[in-house]
Amino acid sequence: MVASAGLLQTSLIWVAYAVAVALVFFVAVITVFTWQTPYDRSKLVTTVAIVSLTALLATVFLLPVDIALVSSTASASRGTKKDWATPERIHGILKTLKIVYYSLYSFDALLCLVVIPFAYFWYEEHDEVLEEEGRETWSTRFWQALKYTIAFIILVIILFLVGFFVPTAAQDHGRHLDLDYFKRLLTNNNGEKALSFGLGLLMTLGVLLYVLYTATGLALLPVSLIKSAPAISAPELSAMTAAELEHNRELQRQIEMRNAGRIVAMSQKDRRELDLLLREERTLVRRQRLAAEASGEGQSTIMRIWTKTQAVFRPLKLFGGILLLCLSVILWISMLITAIDKAANSVCKSHCGYILGHINVFQPVNWVFVKAAKAFPIDYILMAFLILFLFSSSITGIASVGIRFLWVRVFQLKKGRTAPQALLIATVMQALIILAINYAVVNLLAPQYAMYGTQTFCQALSLDPGAPPDCRNHRDMIRPCSESLTDPLAKDVCTPTVMSTFLNRIVLNWTVFGAIDFWAQFAFLTVFLLVFVTSLIRTPRLNLTEIDEEAQADEEEGLLASTSRRFGATWQDITGRAKRTVGGHPNGQGYGTSGTNGTASSR
């Protein structure tokens, strides 16, 4: 009966994980289809991006499962292991977790190092002209993409071989590489060291991206929701554009009347002025059409109702932005508290990656998770929300900063405008960032919760030799396992999570990674603070130039059909006819989209 109770509890945890993975799949689908361009899609790129994001999120969502499983083996109220949690059962749980972790990380590595590069080169090798001429076939395109992918894999293998041989280089100076040497490497567990080197290197690269993109997005995402209402409503934009268009055409009539009846040609000054007015007129005509569509003209009743519903519920968006803003500040404070605590109180400092035995200062995020873990799956839901928030912040950061090489912007991410190459590169960047998010959650945001969950141990001495301590009458002697670093009574009760053990192994084996990852958190906090203060001070402005450029891009792509487009507006959009329209390219920066090279309306 006791054993079946333990099996039921662990099974429910895995069922909750399966449900989370199913939801993650829908999140990945929505993310990919929201950001990719609709007129330049590749089925292979779309599929690879969706599968990759699902696998990456499934990997990071395994952390709360890890925490819940090790927590389920102990009784927090008694400070002892549960009756069903025998060493064999605990070993089986940890072994299952390790298998799932290694499987997911191996699959992630396969996607990021093989599948995504192949999809990238496959798309790059496509040439419509050669295809029409019959000089490009599926096989030639496949082999070209495979050739570049193999070259990329060779570089990666060289890097991992370095990680395999370096661990024992200091102990084996001057020895030749023979079969005994390989055997010694394997028996000394250096294969796992090589794996920890590879993951540590990728995690460190991810931390660098995490500092730039996640910190930026964490500051901008809540502020963008709060400031989502534009500086001008759709009716105001329509009226302003109509007035400018009428003034433009009046100036054209004046020039034409001034030159009417003249035998000689129009002067160069008048010709230049007229050409300038004609170009401006085309821009205003496009903008007027956008404003009309934004006001709901020509749209179905359902779309008009949907637009007004958005306007009515806009205060909820504002309220959600304020809540996320508070959450961002709390996360920042919690990370700062833990980082300072580690820097000041870690016994081994940089020699062990600033591992801390227990938290010395109250840390709000860790406290919330420890309390919520007593009522599973509340902590799982909170952790899922936290991960999705950091994930969304990373996307916002990548969209704001762009994909850059040094200071040169290579690709720009925009909703509905992201090229397939940018989508794949952003997916790899997210993979690296997710590794960094794992590190931040385990080591800074919720170190006690992520390492031991709700496990506690009893400090009371047992009266019977060999019997477990009994704290039923001594509740004051029950301590959290985060304080078990030097207590011998905790070794039989406190089971660390698989993820925390693996991350600690990385920073212990490769202290340089631990030092970089830790001090990079202060850079993260600094970047967040700078972007946060700047975004609060800077007021959003209506960028008509960007609107016109996006409208021109849409029209050149032939996207003239009216689909809904978000026009955040104010109360005038409720009383007027605010509309989401044009080209299916939502954009949170104001009005816009559609059109270019549209012909001027007849005068």
Curated annotation (Swiss-Prot):
<feature type="transmembrane region" description="Helical">
    <location>
        <begin position="150"/>
        <end position="170"/>
    </location>
</feature>
<keyword id="KW-0325">Glycoprotein</keyword>
<comment type="similarity">
    <text>Belongs to the LIMR family. LMBRD1 subfamily.</text>
</comment>
<keyword id="KW-0458">Lysosome</keyword>
<feature type="glycosylation site" description="N-linked (GlcNAc...) asparagine">
    <location>
        <position position="597"/>
    </location>
</feature>
<feature type="transmembrane region" description="Helical">
    <location>
        <begin position="512"/>
        <end position="532"/>
    </location>
</feature>
<feature type="transmembrane region" description="Helical">
    <location>
        <begin position="353"/>
        <end position="373"/>
    </location>
</feature>
<dbReference type="GO" id="GO:0005774">
    <property type="term" value="C:vacuolar membrane"/>
</dbReference>
<feature type="transmembrane region" description="Helical">
    <location>
        <begin position="422"/>
        <end position="442"/>
    </location>
</feature>
<keyword id="KW-0846">Cobalamin</keyword>
<keyword id="KW-0472">Membrane</keyword>
<protein>
    <recommendedName>
        <fullName>Probable lysosomal cobalamin transporter</fullName>
    </recommendedName>
</protein>
<keyword id="KW-1133">Transmembrane helix</keyword>
<feature type="transmembrane region" description="Helical">
    <location>
        <begin position="201"/>
        <end position="221"/>
    </location>
</feature>
<dbReference type="InterPro" id="IPR050854">
    <property type="entry name" value="LMBD1_LysCbl_Transport"/>
</dbReference>
<feature type="transmembrane region" description="Helical">
    <location>
        <begin position="318"/>
        <end position="338"/>
    </location>
</feature>
<feature type="compositionally biased region" description="Gly residues">
    <location>
        <begin position="585"/>
        <end position="595"/>
    </location>
</feature>
<feature type="glycosylation site" description="N-linked (GlcNAc...) asparagine">
    <location>
        <position position="543"/>
    </location>
</feature>
<keyword id="KW-0812">Transmembrane</keyword>
<feature type="glycosylation site" description="N-linked (GlcNAc...) asparagine">
    <location>
        <position position="509"/>
    </location>
</feature>
<dbReference type="GO" id="GO:0072665">
    <property type="term" value="P:protein localization to vacuole"/>
</dbReference>
<feature type="region of interest" description="Disordered">
    <location>
        <begin position="578"/>
        <end position="603"/>
    </location>
</feature>
<feature type="transmembrane region" description="Helical">
    <location>
        <begin position="381"/>
        <end position="401"/>
    </location>
</feature>
<dbReference type="Pfam" id="PF04791">
    <property type="entry name" value="LMBR1"/>
</dbReference>
<feature type="transmembrane region" description="Helical">
    <location>
        <begin position="13"/>
        <end position="33"/>
    </location>
</feature>
<keyword id="KW-0813">Transport</keyword>
<keyword id="KW-0170">Cobalt</keyword>
<dbReference type="InterPro" id="IPR006876">
    <property type="entry name" value="LMBR1-like_membr_prot"/>
</dbReference>
<dbReference type="GO" id="GO:0031419">
    <property type="term" value="F:cobalamin binding"/>
</dbReference>
<feature type="transmembrane region" description="Helical">
    <location>
        <begin position="99"/>
        <end position="119"/>
    </location>
</feature>
<comment type="function">
    <text>Probable lysosomal cobalamin transporter. Required to export cobalamin from lysosomes allowing its conversion to cofactors.</text>
</comment>
<feature type="transmembrane region" description="Helical">
    <location>
        <begin position="50"/>
        <end position="70"/>
    </location>
</feature>
